[in-house]
Each structure stands twice: as C-alpha cells, then as structure tokens.
A protein has these predicted regions:
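Long, contiguous N-terminal structural blocks used for assembly/anchoring
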Residues: 1-48
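Hydrophobic, Leu/Ile/Phe/Ala-enriched alpha-helical segments that form helix-helix packing faces
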Residues: 11-15, 19, 68, 72, ...
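Intrinsically disordered, low-complexity regulatory segments enriched in Ser/Thr/Pro
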Residues: 28-95, 124-125, 144-146
Length: 146
C-alpha cells in the first residue's frame, strides 16, 4: 500500500515527466473530489474541484477555503470552471514540483479529508497524441478508464 509520503514523491516525479498535452486526473474512488493537472507547452496548470461541483456534505466550507487560499490556491471563478486553480510557468524545478504536490495534498488530505492514497484512482491521457492513455505507475494508484 502506498502511504502519503510515497504518493507525494511519486506524484512529483510523474508530473515532471508529463508531455505537453497530458491531462492527469486523481479522483476519490467512487466519489467526486479530485485534483487535475494539465501540461501545456509553456505552463503546468493544476486544479482542485470547487464547491460548485460537490454535494453539500463534501464541500470545503469556510475553514477549508481558508486553508486552500493560504496554501496558495487561487479561488474558484467562472474562467476556471469554478474550481480552485494554480499555474506555473514551465519548465518547473524539482522543488517547484514538490511545492505543488504539497498544496495538492493539503487539498486532498486536510480539506477533502481523504484518508489514504488507496482511496484514490487516476486517469491520464495525452490530448496531443490522439487522447492516447498514459500509464503512470509511479503514482502507486489504480488506473481507471475515461
């Protein structure tokens, strides 16, 4: 079983290897809470699902929103599909990948209260290669289809 530190290291490594056009979605198995990443030619975009898309009992609430904002996430707005978001110019340094993973884990663990990485699944594909599936074993998560 993958624990949070191993998952964090694996996620940083896998993000560093994403090709332009890649989309990676990490979602709560059987749920609707997720983190998503999109690699462009010149930036890496990340988002966490916003309250607009969550059932009342799964919403971040004021304290969760405060944690996300303090971590560096930008507040949801209509231009970012009402999700929490952040973007970094690419390429990123290894430390910047670790920093990004750190704020993603604040969302998944502390705000969404996902107990362990085993409660997550992922899907990944490359929009610039005919939506070809990407297999990312370094995540230590089960892969699901689109």
């Amino acid at each position: 079983m993958t624990e949070w530190p191993e998952f964090a290291a694996g996620l940083a490594e896998q993000l560093a290897g994403l090709p332009a056009g890649a989309i990676l979605t990490i979602v709560e198995a059987g749920g609707s809470r997720y983190a998503q990443f999109r690699q462009f030619d010149d930036l890496l975009y990340a988002e966490l699902v916003g309250d607009e898309w969550l059932a009342t009992e799964n919403r971040t609430g004021d304290s969760g929103a405060r944690l996300l904002a303090e971590a560096g996430w930008r507040r949801p707005d209509r231009y970012h599909t009402d999700n929490w978001w952040i973007e970094y110019p690419w390429p990123l340094t290894p430390q910047r990948y670790r920093d990004l993973v750190s704020i993603v884990l604040i969302g998944l663990r502390r705000v969404f209260e996902i107990a362990e990485p085993a409660d997550l699944v992922y899907n990944a594909w490359n929009t610039e290669d005919g939506d070809r599936d990407l297999v990312l074993p370094g995540l230590g998560l089960r892969r699901v289809s689109k």
